[in-house]
Amino acid sequence: MKKRKAKKTKSKFPIIIIGAVIIGIIVFYFYSADQAKIRGFAFGNEIQTLQEEIRNEQGQFISSIAKWNENAISNEEMIGIGEKHLETFNKLLNKYDELQPPDAFSRSVKLLKLSLEYQIESHEYRLEWIKTGDVTELIRSQELTQLSFEAEQAGLKSFNDAKAGIEQ
């Protein structure tokens, strides 16, 4: 009888190990999934904050242009405002490089960054137009503004698709 008990104990040991490994794998899977959700949520907050900063800075610049159009701001003042604006936009552009997007969102980050690059270039041309009065500078600025808008729309669509789990 004692030998039978020994065999039973030995046969239970591999089953216990296999059960522990399976439980460990399940715990790891759910932990990894939770961590991915947390990273995704943190990334979503970071990109939203960055987009809001860009939108606010853009709004201030547009407001200054409106004042300049009404002759409430001189050309020199507008150029100074524009140069500070470009500095701010370039700092915001660098923030895109600091983001660590989940793989599904990398395309949207590239497009949103491209949009801001177009905006910066557009505003450089606009400032050059203010300085020189050369209408071709204004036309180029407007073209780049359109490209910026298109890149931003594509970036937002890509972001929403990634959020919904749609392959890109």
Where do the language-model regions lie?
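Low-complexity, intrinsically disordered/propeptide-like segments
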Residues: R4, I16, Y31-A33, P102, ...
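Helix-centric, low-specificity signal for extended rod-like, repetitive segments
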Residues: M1, F30-S32, L112, Q119
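Alpha-helical segments in soluble extracytoplasmic regions
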Residues: A42-Q168
